Structures are given as structure tokens and as C-alpha cells.
Amino acid sequence: MSFLVLPPEVNSALMFAGAGSGPTLAAAAAWDGLAAELGQAANSFSSATAALADTAWQGPAATAMAAAAAPYASWLSTAATRALSAAAQAKAAAAVYEAARAATVDPLLVAANRHQLVSLVLSNLFGQNAPAIAATEAAYEQLWAADVAAMVSYHSGASAVAAQLAPWAQAVRALPNPTAPALASGPAALAIPALGIGNTGIGNIFSIGNIGDYNLGNGNTGNANLGSGNTGQANLGSGNTGFFNFGSGNTANTNFGSGNLGNLNLGSGNDGNGNFGLGNIGDGNRGSGNVGSFNFGTANAGSFNVGSANHGSPNVGFANLGNNNLGIANLGNNNLGIANLGNNNIGIGLTGDNMIGIGALNSGIGNLGFGNSGNNNIGLFNSGNNNIGFFNSGDSNFGFFNSGDTNTGFGNAGFTNTGFGNAGSGNFGFGNAGNNNFGFGNSGFENMGVGNSGAYNTGSFNSGTLNTGDLNSGDFNTGWANSGDINTGGFHSGDLNTGFGSPVDQPVMNSGFGNIGTGNSGFNNSGDANSGFQNTNTGAFFIGHSGLLNSGGGQHVGISNSGTGFNTGLFNTGFNNTGIGNSATNAAFTTTSGVANSGDNSSGGFNAGNDQSGFFDG
């Protein structure tokens, strides 16, 4: 495997465990000795030949013998020079190695970082070590980058040294021997052919359509990618934009998962850095659907919360609305207990400040249930208002553990979602950190599919924009694993290609067949900037549709959407709907998600009224 994708534990260990520069310096000394011997032999041979020509060799035969001996003397002199050059290059190679070893991170430092991480994680019972864990991971990324930089420098220096070596075949070819040309051609006969087609670069093996070097896959733009359709370096997966992503559809660097927008995320659909889980917005979150940083749990809106559906910072528990609460459904600050309405209380159901004891079943008004500190709730332990369910700190939710508003489902920190674990808003699905997505694990916006960090895609694992298909890091493509733009087919790193595996930019207006307009890919589209099949862009937006059979204003995503624009999913009309068969107009630029809703700013299903969650509300 390439050093570009190896962690510092491996690169550092390999560099420090090797034989060092000793054998190379010994080889340099041997080459110096050989050069001296060859030089002495050349001088002796020339002297002997000259002496014979002056004494024993006479006549035409002597002239012929001297002419035959001269090339051997010349070859010995050339060989001595070549040996001296090889010695110099061996010394240079040793110097390059020593410089690379000095720049490589000591394995003990890497081990100390990993030991520190394990210690912090094991003692992180209440999330108090989250900042230190994030800092340790950031330091580890720097160690990784330092090792890769050292190895890249080593590779470059060693390649430069090797390029200076003169081939011995030229010297062999000068010998007056009929077998010399055959011997000289030996290395050329052993050269490995380029095992790929349509690549621009070197070392792309069994692959097509790459721009760059050492890619094992197709349609990449960049170097050392193991996968297809990547834009960047050393990605292990497909459709990534960035460096060393392990997964697909990521935008940025060193993500382990899919559809992440940011760095060092472990999971999918995260927007931020150092998250572990699904659909988080922010940094250092452990869990799903959190908005903020260093939360441990689900659907927290704030930072340093431990638990779920907390709205504020830093709370420990569930559905607290405020700051520094320890317990459940407290509305206020610095409370210890359950369903307290106020500040600095210790107890259950207290209304007021600085109280100790047990109050009413519900501290809010108009509630049906128990432990509600908000108003007009039906259920248990709601600190928000107008909720049906339990543990909601937001308003107008149908479900549980929602810290956002007007959600149908559970664990949503965003607004008007139908599903669960969404930190974004207007989603139909789960684990989305972006907005208006149909599917799961999307950190981008208005996608229909899985693991997209880009926008307006119909498909999965796209880090580009407005693609119909999968694993594209480019834009406006119909197909698979394209790192170029406006292509129809697969594995293109160039632009406007139809077919498979081209690194070339074509001088045409559209790719595909039957398209009318400019910037289209796919089949039978009309208008501008569409991807997919039989889409018609008649709106004022320059950007068109992705998917199949969409019509009307621009930027519909999915199948058979119509209306003024920005619908994602299936059979939606109107404006800014996500889901199936919604017809809301959302005149105030709100969002509707779910199934067959006609009301604005609603989630769920079959709601005709505005600002509704759940099902069948008028």
C-alpha cells in the first residue's frame, strides 16, 4: 500500500526500523573502490597496448589490433567514470534518507499520542474530556501529515537521485561485440507497460480516465487515490473531494465514513470536525443529530451537553431548556431535578427560583401528562411548548427527544424534519446535517440519496453538485465516479465527455444525447445545467434539475417534481418541499417535509394546515 495512505504508526515504524543509511554508504565506498580499480585497469591497458604497438606489433595487422583494442580501453575509462558517479549518487541517496528520517515523527511520540487518547476516552464518563480528545486527535492529524510530508520528500529526493544514474547499457552498446545490442536492450524489454487507458499521469494501473499519478481506480483527479471519482489525494473510497478520506462522498480531509463535510469525522453526514456519529453540525460531538460542539448524546442544541434533546449549554440529562441543568425537562438555569420552571431549583415540578421540594405534576400550564415544564404539551417531560410526545425541548413537535421545532420523529435538533437524528432542517430521513435532504447521512443540502456532502444530487456519495448518479466529485454529471464536469457515463476526469474514462475536455455544449441548451448531461433534457433524464428547466434559475422527469423552476432533485423550485424527492409541487407528494407553497421561504402535506412549514403526513407536525392536521 502507498505510504500516502498509511498512518504514522506504520510510516514512522518502517522508517525507524529499517537498516538505515549504513548499507548505502557501504555501497558508495564499494563503488569508489571499483572506480579506482577500473581507472587503474584502463591506464594499464592503454599503456600496454601503446607499448606493443611501438615494439612487437608491426604492419597492417598491428594497426588492426590497435584499432580493436582502443574501444576496450575507452570502455574501461567510461566504466570508471560511471562507477564514480554511482558512488556519488549512493552518497546522495544516503543524505536524502537521513533528511527524511530526521523529518519523520519518532514512533514513541506517536505511541504517546495514542496512549493519551485511550486514557482520555476511558475517563470521559461525562464528556468532560471532549476538548482534550479533539485536541489529541488534531495533534495526531498533524503527526500523520508530518510523516506523509517526510515520505513525499523522501520519494521525490530518491527519484531525483535515481534519475541522475546513467544506464550501463550505453557503455555495453559501445563494445565491438554482436551480442552487446541484445544485452543493452534487456532493461527495455523488462519495462512494465502502462496497464490502463485514457490516463494522464504515471503509475495508474488497471484504470481509466485518471488525471494524476498512482491512482488505483477510475476517473480520479489527483494522486494516489484507491477508488474512483475522487478529487484530491490519497482517498480510499470514491466520490471524495479532499485528502485521505476513508469512505465515499466526503468533502475535506481525513474522514472515516461517508458524506461528511469537514475533517476527522468518524461516521456519516456530519458537518464539522472531529465528530463521531451521524448528522452532527459542529465539532467534537459524540452521537447523532447534535447542533453545537462537544455534545455527548442525541439532538442536543448547544455545547458540552451530556444526554439528549438538551437546548442550551452545558446540561446533563434530557430535554432541558436552559443552561447548567442536571436532570430532565428543566426550563431555566442551574436546576437539579425534574420539570422545574425557573432557576437554581432542587426538586421536581417547582415553579420559581431558588426552591427545594416537590411541586405540581406539571410546572407549565395547559399540559396533559407528567413532568412538563413547558405549556400545552401532551406527554411526558417536555420543556418546550405544544408538543405531543416526551422529552422535547423544542416547540410543536410530534415525537420525542426533539430540541428543534415542528419535527415529526425523534432526536431532531433542526426544524421541520420528518425522521430522526437530523441536525439540519427540512429533511425527510435520518442523520442529515444538511438541509432539505431526502435520505440519510447527507451533510450537503437538497440531495436525494445517501452520504452526499455536495448539493442538488440525485444519487449517493457525491461530493460534487447537481449530479445524477453516484460517487461523483465533479459537477453536473450523469453517471458514476466522475471527477470532471458535465459528463455522461463514468470515470471521466475531463469535462463534457460521453462514454467512459476520458481525461480530455471536449469542445461541445452538452454531453449525452438529445439535450437542448447548454451545460446539460444525460438524455433528452431541455434548458440549462440539467443532469439526468428528460428534465425541463423553464424557471429563472440558471441551475437546472437533477434526476428524472422534473419540470418547472430550477433545482428540483429527484423524480417528477414540478413547481417553482427547490423540491426534493418524488412528485412534489409548489416550493421548497422535501418528501413525497407535498404541495406547500412556503411563500415565506419556510420548508415542508413529509408525505402529502399542503401546509407551509409543516412535517409529517397529510397536513393541510401551516406549522403542523404529525399527521392529518387541518
Curated annotation (Swiss-Prot):
Single Gene Ontology BP annotation: response to host immune response
Domain of life: Bacteria
Gene3D superfamilies in alphabetical order: PPE superfamily (1.20.1260.20)
Region described as Disordered: spans on this chain: 598-618
Keyword Signal: yes
Keyword Signal: yes
Signal peptide start-end: 1-29
Keywords, comma-separated and alphabetical: Signal
Family membership: Belongs to the mycobacterial PPE family.
Protein name: Uncharacterized PPE family protein PPE16
Organism: Mycobacterium tuberculosis (strain ATCC 25618 / H37Rv)
Lineage, highest ranks first: Bacteria, Bacillati, Actinomycetota, Actinomycetes, Mycobacteriales
Gene field: PPE16
